[in-house]
């Protein structure tokens, strides 16, 4: 049975260059991730998810590094394949004592179809609203605790501190990296489709199939990164809004009790007004407490999602890049060509079908 193999070395050279660009892009993504996705402490307001988040980052960064390394190996394998074909051509020329002509004239078919520049990450939130501490606040806290047993400082104020600016910056970085990776996958897919038009045979099928595996892997990784970024950005927005709600509730409580304290010296009604105001303040701070509990429940859901993403990246391995190239040593018998092509070897041109 004869197997048909055709190759245009100009096209193969251009494709290996495109795969090398993809490797450079993936290396840049890994470098950016190493700088922007760092383990840290975003404070008590995001504390519920921080353990899972910090455990995720090493897995993500390792996968990003593996992508760059694996794609670089694949680009080198394609260059080796092109060299192999050239040696084979030279062997055929020597066998027939012919004059070889390298007709490679370059190729403009392998242009990138998607942008891979990593968008500069920026925070999506400003600093958290804060409670102004002072004598009125402490007085209200003491009165509420004395009459209700609820400590505003421990249950509210200390829980709304944190760095949502830095957290949302990292969320933005996740999205930028995922978007860039989608672009790399699109470029590889386009290149694989283009090379299939001029390179056929077992080696071509193996190399193009491997690129297809890469495209699927990168697309899946990119989707995880983008979703992760969206969730982090959203939880930062939720945290900011929760902090604002807490501050507004506490301010309302302070104003209510402060107004009552101003009338405490009135005989018969002063203390009663204070007690009534304290209970009104308690109702206000309980709304704030409920807002924090709602945020914590959302954080628990985000934590579960982060753990799922970590499991994905822990199990995700970059495709093994060992492109199956014909092992040609340049010996005359490596490839049997149509005799019509021997006098002027067709390196770099679209040749007649080669039988092997």
Residue ranges and their predicted role:
Residues 1-173, 180-198, 210-213, 217-356:
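Intrinsically disordered, low-complexity Pro/Gly/Thr/Ser/Ala-rich repeat tracts
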């Amino acid at each position: 049975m004869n197997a048909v193999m055709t190759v245009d070395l100009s096209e193969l050279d251009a494709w290996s260059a495109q795969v090398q660009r993809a490797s450079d892009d993936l290396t840049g993504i890994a470098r950016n991730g190493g700088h922007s996705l760092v383990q840290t402490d975003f404070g008590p307001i995001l504390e519920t998810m921080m353990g899972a988040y910090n455990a995720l980052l090493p897995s993500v960064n390792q996968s990003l590094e593996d992508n760059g390394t694996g794609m670089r190996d694949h680009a080198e394998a394609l260059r080796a394949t092109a060299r192999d074909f050239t040696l084979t051509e030279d062997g055929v020329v020597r066998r027939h004592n012919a004059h070889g002509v390298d007709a490679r004239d370059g190729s403009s078919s392998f242009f990138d179809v998607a942008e891979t520049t990593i968008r500069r990450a920026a925070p999506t939130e400003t600093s958290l609203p804060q409670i102004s501490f002072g004598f009125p606040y402490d007085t209200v806290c003491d009165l509420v605790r004395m009459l209700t047993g609820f400590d505003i400082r421990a249950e509210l104020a200390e829980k709304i501190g944190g760095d949502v600016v830095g957290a949302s910056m990292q969320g933005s970085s996740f999205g930028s990296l995922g978007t860039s990776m989608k672009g790399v996958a699109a470029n590889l897919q386009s290149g694989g489709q283009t090379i299939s038009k001029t390179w056929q045979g077992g080696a071509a099928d193996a190399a193009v199939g491997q690129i297809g595996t890469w495209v699927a892997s990168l697309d899946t990784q990119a989707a995880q990164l983008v979703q992760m970024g969206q969730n982090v950005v959203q939880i930062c927005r939720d945290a900011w809004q929760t902090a604002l709600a807490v501050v507004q509730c506490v301010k309302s409580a302070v104003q209510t009790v402060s107004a009552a304290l101003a009338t405490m010296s009135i005989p018969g009604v002063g203390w009663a007004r204070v007690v009534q105001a304290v209970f009104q303040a308690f109702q206000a701070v309980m709304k704030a407490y409920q807002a924090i509990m709602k945020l914590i429940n959302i954080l628990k859901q985000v934590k579960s999602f982060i753990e799922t993403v970590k499991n994905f990246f822990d199990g995700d391995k970059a495709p093994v890049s060992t492109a199956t190239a014909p092992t040609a040593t340049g010996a005359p018998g490596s490839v049997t060509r149509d005799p019509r092509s021997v006098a002027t070897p067709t390196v770099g041109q679209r040749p007649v079908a080669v039988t092997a």
